[in-house]
Each structure stands twice: as C-alpha cells, then as structure tokens.
Amino acid sequence: MHPLQCVLQVQRSLGWGPLASVSWLSLRMCRAHSSLSSTMCPSPERQEDGARKDFSSRLAAGPTFQHFLKSASAPQEKLSSEVEDPPPYLMMDELLGRQRKVYLETYGCQMNVNDTEIAWSILQKSGYLRTSNLQEADVILLVTCSIREKAEQTIWNRLHQLKALKTRRPRSRVPLRIGILGCMAERLKEEILNREKMVDILAGPDAYRDLPRLLAVAESGQQAANVLLSLDETYADVMPVQTSASATSAFVSIMRGCDNMCSYCIVPFTRGRERSRPIASILEEVKKLSEQVFLPPRPPKVLGLQGLKEVTLLGQNVNSFRDNSEVQFNSAVPTNLSRGFTTNYKTKQGGLRFAHLLDQVSRVDPEMRIRFTSPHPKDFPDEVLQLIHERDNICKQIHLPAQSGSSRVLEAMRRGYSREAYVELVHHIRESIPGVSLSSDFIAGFCGETEEDHVQTVSLLREVQYNMGFLFAYSMRQKTRAYHRLKDDVPEEVKLRRLEELITIFREEATKANQTSVGCTQLVLVEGLSKRSATDLCGRNDGNLKVIFPDAEMEDVNNPGLRVRAQPGDYVLVKITSASSQTLRGHVLCRTTLRDSSAYC
C-alpha cells in the first residue's frame, strides 16, 4: 500500500478532515506500517472481504439522507475558544504552546493585518505567549504578501537576516522555529521549503487553524506545511485578538477570496474563490469591538465608554459580499451591477448582499465609524450609494480601483468595464454622495501598454482628481492569465518612468482636490501623537485623510465650561487651514460626538 493511501484511509475512517500536506512524521509512520504489512496483515483476499463487510456495517450505521439535509444548512456559529481534538498521531499536550513565545511580523495589505490577529487568536488558545522582542522569541512567523515581486524579495531578505539569528541560538534554549504564513506560502511553497531549509512551517491563508499541529510536527525537526485552499473557510468562529491596547480602529474580515480573475492578479490563486461570512458572526464581532475597552495614554477628565471608534470591513472584493447561510434569502434575486459593468464569471443569485450587511453594521453603534475596502467598481448598485449618503457613521469615502485610463488596457486586464463606464460611475457616485472622497489604484506599464495608453491614464487622473491614490509599476506573477497569455513587453525603465509621471500628476491633482477643504470644519477621529512633532496630534477625517493639529485644550460640547485635551478615540472638530496631496492641517475647535458633529460640519 502506498504511504499516502495509508494516511488517507486512516483519515477517512477516524473522521478528521483532509490534511493539506502530509507531514513527514505521519509518512514515516505509514512507511513503517507498509513495510510490516507482509507479515502482520492478512492476505489481500481476506483483507478485501473484511474491508467490504466493515464498509457495509459502517454504511448501515451511518447518517441518513435526512441527516445530510439537516446538517447541510449552515449553523449559527458562536465565537469559540475551544481547542480542537488533535489528529491521531499527535497527543493533545503536543499541540500546546507551553508558554513558548511567538513573534509575528506582518507584510502587505489590511487583510494580512487581520490574518495576523486570527493566527494569534488560534495560537493564544493553544497556550502560546506573544512577544514584541525578536530576541526572546521561540517562534517567528512572517505573514507575507505576494502581490508584487518586490514584496516577495522583502521576505527573502528577511529570511536571510533570521537565518543568522537561528544559527546563533544558544543550545540551552529550545530550537527557534520560523514559519511563513499567507500568500507567499501559498504561491511558493516548494521553493521556500527547498531553498530555505531554515523555514520550519508553511501555512496558507486558509490553514491558520492548523498552526498548532504544524508547530508540533516542527518540534520533531521536520518541516511541515498546509497550503490547502478552502471553499468555505472564513474563520467566522474565530475572534481576532486586537494587537494594540491603545487602538482606536479595527479590521473585520467579512469575506475571503476573489472570483474576478483579473489577468494581472495573483489573489485568486493565493486566497481562493469568494466565500462570505454569515452576517450574524460579523455583527457579533463588531458588537464586541464597540464594547472593547482600551487604555488611553493619559487619563481622561471625563470618564466614558472607550470602545473602538472605527471598523473597516475587509475583503478582496468586499462589496460582492453574499451571505447564503440563511435559506429563506436564497431565492433567485438578480445581482445588480454598476451601469456599463460586466463580470468574467457566471453571476451568482440570492443571498443577503453588501447593502444589507452595511445597513446592519451601521446600526450596531451610532458612534462607530464604518469603512470598507477593497471594493470592485462593478458592485456599486444604487442601494449601496444611497445608504452611504444617508448614514452619518458610514464614511463618505470610496476606494474605486481604476488600474488604467485606457479602455484597451482595461480589456486586456479583464476588468469588466471601459474608461467611459468608469467615468460615468464616478459622476454618479459624486451626485449620489456630495463631498465624497475618492481613492484609486493604478498600474503603470501593464502588458502591451503604449505611450497613448499611458497618456489616457494621465488624463483620467486629471479628470477625476482623486484624494488618495496607490500607484505601482506592473509586476508579472506566475499562474495569472497575463503570465500565460500576454507578454511583459514594457521595459523596466519605461515602467518606472511612467510610474513617476503618474505619481507626479496624482500629487498635483490631489493637492487641488484637498485644498477645497481649506476653511472648512471637519470631524476628526484622534489616533494619537503626530510622528513628526510631539506637540501635534494626528487623526483622520471622514475621507480617510490624515489631519494634523496642535495638542491644545478645548471645550467639550457635551460638558459646557469644561476644558479638555484630546486623546485617542475622541472625535474633535478641526478647522482646516492648509492642505497637501496627503495631509490636512488645522486648529482644533472642540471635542464632540459623531452624532452631534453634523450641526457643525
């Protein structure tokens, strides 16, 4: 019998789920089993007959079709802190951290920040401790990004640095274990294990529940990996552990994966297909965050609730959210796309959509700001725009990734829209949400991009005048459609030159857009001290722009006559006096609440 067949048979018969990759420990056990099979096992005929009888008896005692139908409906999961049963080849105590210290480093997007909190929640329940001191760590985990080559090169360089740390490890301490988590583990699993023997574990974005097992296997001196992508993993029952005791905001993952299959993008291959969390679990997490108490850096003069004041809903394609967990909402209701937009896949039907979720989340706490990222322009039906306009605590800021201003390049990118459709959507959004702040993504030097295509992108930047932007040179990724069907034919120096031009134009136009705020009074959520001045405070306005203002005493509108100093988590009114492409400056007027601020802004 092949060793892998042995593992799979044990797996099925004992009822525990599929392993993404079989550890060397379990393979060794199976090899030992198969090498002794000729003397310890019955003849093949008797074995086959016994297996058939055993299968028949288990089938008769197994669940009925009615049981299957009942279990197929998604349960209302509660956030659980229980440790799952160990696989048969490990004892329960081998899965426990025994107070070993874990050091976590996060690279890349906001989803990775949230993934770090999920991974830490799982490890904490298994008995690990967290440290911010690299030197005292027993386990170092890097949560990685694979969106561009530069992001991966950063990790390779970091591993080279950690190799020296592992080599110098005193023998009196437990061996240092190093793990790669996230998208890079998913994309380059074999290369990482073969190239960097000092890497002990790999865990893809859908395998964080398996971290205790992987670390237990690594304790035997073997490399261990789980990079299986899931069709249903959302970590809905895992309450992420917020990593900062003084944080004013938090990320809440509402869905994972992406179905868009844009030709340049590696995300569908590193994070899998779209699947959404049940709304009930999202609301439970948001409620906990609104009640979560954090300690401000200085005692407030007026004590009150210090729950988190801002939540950002996260997803690779956040506004395509679709909760199909409740059967009564699974009727074939058509999906409304933005006008002039199409999809590259068969449009799904039914379920509770993003507008319903946004409505419910905004009702949890009227004093909590709600943001979301990263959306796709195709999924902005009127009901979403109307809700953003009506609710005071849903930020009037929309990220609208364009990627290019050329319809020809957009078609090659498989974005599902033309330049004209995109511009029409921009106008519609601004009409629906007066004063909305817009941000976008752009790629310079995509496959086949000509100078004329580049000029069209420049003109789009000038036409729209974004408040914020994220601009990058194109980086070819293996497995993508562009890698298989297009040619990366724009020279690197041309990509960089075009990128610099886009950045220059963006800054010019963003400065113009932001200067319209000068003289206006804006509501700012205080985050803390400015990084550049100990006498200034820093916060963000409704449009997610950074606002700097002096740390001075002010009035509290809810406590007339009381003078206070702002602290993280406070809402303050700031009169804007100057603006650049990235920052607003002003002077503080008073401390207020989100609901009361509408009378002043």
UniProtKB/Swiss-Prot annotation:
Give the residue spans that cross the bilayer. none
Could you list this entry's UniProt keywords, alphabetically sorted.
Answer: 4Fe-4S, Iron, Iron-sulfur, Metal-binding, Mitochondrion, S-adenosyl-L-methionine, Transferase, Transit peptide, tRNA processing
Q: PROSITE patterns in the record, alphabetically? A: MTTASE_N (PS51449), MTTASE_RADICAL (PS01278), RADICAL_SAM (PS51918), TRAM (PS50926)
What Enzyme Commission number(s) does the record list for this chain? 2.8.4.3
Q: Which PANTHER family match?
A: CDK5 REGULATORY SUBUNIT-ASSOCIATED PROTEIN 1 (PTHR43020), MITOCHONDRIAL TRNA METHYLTHIOTRANSFERASE CDK5RAP1 (PTHR43020:SF2)
Report the principal subcellular site: mitochondrion
Classification via Pfam families: Radical_SAM, TRAM, UPF0004
Where [4Fe-4S] cluster 1 binds, per the record, is at 109, 145, 183
| Disulfide bridge map | none
Q: What stretch of residues directs this protein to its organelle as a transit peptide?
A: 1-33
Chloroplast as UniProt keyword? no
Q: Into which family does the record put it?
A: Belongs to the methylthiotransferase family. MiaB subfamily.
Q: What is this protein called?
A: Mitochondrial tRNA methylthiotransferase CDK5RAP1
User: What is one GO biological process annotated to this record?
Assistant: negative regulation of cell cycle
UniProt-annotated binding residues for [4Fe-4S] cluster 2? 258, 262, 265
Domain TRAM as annotated: residue spans: 515-590
Q: Which reaction does it catalyse?
A: N(6)-dimethylallyladenosine(37) in tRNA + (sulfur carrier)-SH + AH2 + 2 S-adenosyl-L-methionine = 2-methylsulfanyl-N(6)-dimethylallyladenosine(37) in tRNA + (sulfur carrier)-H + 5'-deoxyadenosine + L-methionine + A + S-adenosyl-L-homocysteine + 2 H(+)
Pinpoint the Radical SAM core domain residues: 244-512
Record note on what altering residue 265 to A does: Loss of mitochondrial tRNAs methylthiotransferase activity
| Coiled coil stretches, renumbered | none
Q: How does it assemble?
A: Interacts with CDK5R1 (p35 form). CDK5RAP1, CDK5RAP2 and CDK5RAP3 show competitive binding to CDK5R1. Forms a complex with CDK5R1 and CDK5.
Cofactor(s) for this UniProt protein: [4Fe-4S] cluster
Q: Which InterPro entries match?
A: Elp3/MiaA/NifB-like_rSAM (IPR006638), Methylthiotransferase (IPR005839), Methylthiotransferase_CS (IPR020612), Methylthiotransferase_N (IPR013848), Methylthiotransferase_N_sf (IPR038135), MiaB_methiolase (IPR006463), rSAM (IPR007197), rSAM_horseshoe (IPR023404)
Single GO molecular-function term? N6-isopentenyladenosine methylthiotransferase activity
Q: Which residues form the MTTase N-terminal domain?
A: 100-220
